[in-house]
Amino acid sequence: MTLAKIELLKQLLRDNEAKTVLKQTTVDQYNIIRKFNTSRIEKNPSLRMKWAMCSNFPLALTKGDMANRIPLEYKGIQLKTNAEDIGTKGQMCSIAAVTWWNTYGPIGDTEGFEKVYESFFLRKMRLDNATWGRITFGPVERVRKRVLLNPLTKEMPPDEASNVIMEILFPKEAGIPRESTWIHRELIKEKREKLKGTMITPIVLAYMLERELVARRRFLPVAGATSAEFIEMLHCLQGENWRQIYHPGGNKLTESRSQSMIVACRKIIRRSIVASNPLELAVEIANKTVIDTEPLKSCLTAIDGGDVACDIIRAALGLKIRQRQRFGRLELKRISGRGFKNDEEILIGNGTIQKIGIWDGEEEFHVRCGECRGILKKSKMRMEKLLINSAKKEDMKDLIILCMVFSQDTRMFQGVRGEINFLNRAGQLLSPMYQLQRYFLNRSNDLFDQWGYEESPKASELHGINELMNASDYTLKGVVVTKNVIDDFSSTETEKVSITKNLSLIKRTGEVIMGANDVSELESQAQLMITYDTPKMWEMGTTKELVQNTYQWVLKNLVTLKAQFLLGKEDMFQWDAFEAFESIIPQKMAGQYSGFARAVLKQMRDQEVMKTDQFIKLLPFCFSPPKLRSNGEPYQFLRLVLKGGGENFIEVRKGSPLFSYNPQTEVLTICGRMMSLKGKIEDEERNRSMGNAVLAGFLVSGKYDPDLGDFKTIEELEKLKPGEKANILLYQGKPVKVVKRKRYSALSNDISQGIKRQRMTVESMGWALS
């Protein structure tokens, strides 16, 4: 600045007005610079933000009642100024004002927040109820795996989720729902109810719903548990040299759905392989299987992974599967090479000759068994090299054995010492390669003794492994353990495969990648309810599953069954559904239970006292030919015991864990699942809970009497004393006066009159059912 300019400035400052303007309007304010800047594009956004936030009052408050609630200062800290922001015309305030507002500001209406941000509140619940253990320091072996980032309410493909979200938020604009959308109607209905009346913008609702329904998966380095409940807290559970023990609170719905899907697929395959056409039966059962309220096909489409059984059912239903090959517990993915199969006769160690398909050609595979991963190189009848990572001894041992068998090494064939005639759960003889697999998993010493040992490698990152799966100076020939991490399969590619009649999956190249023999024979209890809507499958289930499926079928066909019963059609007991139910009744009791159940139902029909819940309860027990006492009388029971012991019984005259009925709500509870009978019980029968078909214990004594007041409800009628009168609406809505009987001797007469009307109605439609 020149001397002349300084003189001019001093002269200007002598003018009080000019001095005030210059003092109050600082030219270093960013907003003023921006206002007179010709360019609208921000040249350096980062610098702009830093510059703004370094000033005392970088924020602008919109004028109004809310802004007035913030004081000028709090405990010596200035929160705002009365100066006006030139750019926004708002009041200027400091960043401390935000902290003050969050801490001391008014609390608005938060109704609906928990419903909208449910996934965040559930995360907080899991965190609040979590158990934290100690932190351990030291090297952590983390493996890159494809993991789900956060738990989901219900996993589904993105396009399906967008249709469901549209149906929840904009039902009028969504149009006619597709079948794939409509199968989620329970979820749609539940979410609509929850979100009704919330004042949050639809875009936020849509984002939060997407977070609950669409899976976000990433390849992340993980040590230990990989379920979404752990992955959402991964940042505070492990690092390169530390680990924190943590167990989340709450339940794991996604895992339950996936686990139930695996259980269902395994059972379907186990049932199908004994059929004349396994593929046809598997498709039929799979299309009629529901997990919770969702079709199995929808689960298989939405949920990533599963096991061999899931992939076989996917292929049967025409869905794509991940690029994998299976050999029992061993999972393989080809890295390079190609093999060609030729049938050869092989002399094995026990002196027998087996015809086996031998693979010729050099091949390299990425292999996995449980948590143990490795790289396998093989040629014709020889395992060249197997490099594995350190894991649980059981997984390491199984991986080594399965790779030795899969390689069809001559030493493996020579290691057989005993019989290799193994059967699957269906009682079918396994093929030779699966016989060998089963044999050596049970008798590993035969294989390791024959295999031989060699000196361990000298490299620092490699070590040998002995027959006890311990690090050693000598190692099983060709087998090496690396201290480095072998990452999990990273491919996400899917492919369409063809499936044979016997449930073998074949690639376009003709290579068999898995089959029914690769399905695990482990049996486990499903965490969610599985419904197989076909009697062909029911006998495979547990007692509870069979009870549930049978009674569900009875409810579905109740009108037909009831009509046939009232018309006296005895062949009505011979349904396929009841044949499956018979398999859970102890054999020596089946005839006695049938005789008893048929006698009770006949008595109900003859005395014309229809009790729908009792009819449903006893009907499945009537399948077997009835067995009576020597005098022709039926055996009597208060409890009908089923196979399996424990809670597997049905009480005849009261509720039990398997079957109970609430006449007030007209709800049946079958194995814990509620099923409504509303609309399936006639008004006359409903009133019989008070005594009879018309009104047990009451006599219709005339027309409506205004002096007696309003119409009484059934509950109020029960409180009347003998001889008292009241107005009621009869079952067809007819207003009448009734008097409570002093004696109950006419009870059966009341009942029979009502039932006769019901029976006449059924008989009039009998021609349609004959």
From Swiss-Prot:
Domain of life: Viruses
Gene3D superfamilies linked to this entry: Polymerase Basic Protein 2, C-terminal domain (3.30.30.90)
GO molecular function term, any single one: RNA-directed RNA polymerase activity
GO biological process: 7-methylguanosine mRNA capping; cap snatching; DNA-templated transcription; symbiont-mediated suppression of host gene expression; symbiont-mediated suppression of host mRNA transcription via inhibition of RNA polymerase II activity; viral RNA genome replication
Pfam families membership: Flu_PB2_1st (PF20947), Flu_PB2_2nd (PF20948), Flu_PB2_3rd (PF20949), Flu_PB2_4th (PF20950), Flu_PB2_5th (PF00604), Flu_PB2_6th (PF20951), Flu_PB2_7th (PF20952)
ATP-binding in keyword set: no
InterPro entries xref list: Flu_PB2_2nd (IPR049110), Flu_PB2_6th (IPR049114), Flu_PB2_C (IPR049115), Flu_PB2_CAP-bd (IPR048298), Flu_PB2_middle (IPR049111), Flu_PB2_N (IPR049106), INV_PB2 (IPR001591), PB2_helical (IPR049113)
Keywords in alphabetical order: Cap snatching, Eukaryotic host gene expression shutoff by virus, Eukaryotic host transcription shutoff by virus, Host gene expression shutoff by virus, Host nucleus, Host-virus interaction, Inhibition of host RNA polymerase II by virus, mRNA capping, mRNA processing, Viral transcription, Virion
Motif Nuclear localization signal, chain ranges: 740-743
Subcellular locations according to the entry: Virion; Host nucleus
GO CC terms, sorted: host cell nucleus; virion component
Lipid biosynthesis among keywords: no
Protein family according to the UniProt entry: Belongs to the influenza viruses PB2 family.
Subunit text: Influenza RNA polymerase is composed of three subunits: PB1, PB2 and PA. Interacts (via N-terminus) with PB1 (via C-terminus). Interacts with nucleoprotein NP (via N-terminus).
Biological role stated in the UniProt entry: Plays an essential role in transcription initiation and cap-stealing mechanism, in which cellular capped pre-mRNAs are used to generate primers for viral transcription. Recognizes and binds a wide range of cap structures of target pre-RNAs which are subsequently cleaved after 10-13 nucleotides by the viral protein PA. Plays a role in the initiation of the viral genome replication and modulates the activity of the ribonucleoprotein (RNP) complex.
Protein name: Polymerase basic protein 2
Organism: Influenza B virus (strain B/Panama/45/1990)
Gene name in the database record: PB2
